[in-house]
Amino acid sequence: MGMDLTNYVEVRDHKTGEWKIAPVQVETVHYEAEHMDKPCCLTKIVYEYDYAQPWYGRNSELFSILEGGNYNSILSYSRGLPSDVSKEVYDFHEQFKNEDFDGYWSYGESYLTLAELSSALTDRKKYPKWIKYRDEFGSKIKEHGSYWDLKDFVDAIRYFTNLVPGVYDSNDVRVVFWFDC
């Protein structure tokens, strides 16, 4: 069992000051090894998003940075959902509490602005940047250093923000996230 990171990018409306989910239509392609011991056998997986979700799935390094644990520094302790969270993100979060969602549950609800995340990237010493290999549960797992995982996360948020019409300051862009299993 593992924890997935559920996350959505929100932008602040310049006219009303309200936060809204970043509405984008995007298709991403991800290649995944069918068998961890045979990385040559890759399967093409296409994800389609109606809303900006900069990260899909599990990543223990990013989890440690966002929620704490292991050896990493934590960016911020859980703040809960923002009081002014967009209706769409609030509704998505409520689905995880619904019994019809097959018993999924969430924890570690929080949010960070693009400014906060970008600032964290300036201090590379906090985050190991080497690539590690380790054997765990009989399979080979390749983990990228946590600095690069954070950088990829921030780059994805910037990418999605650029798809939204308008110009946004880094304090007017945030990612709202939680963990679920």
What residues fall within each predicted segment?
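Acidic (Asp/Glu-rich) sequence patches and key acidic residues
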Residues: 1-173, 180-181
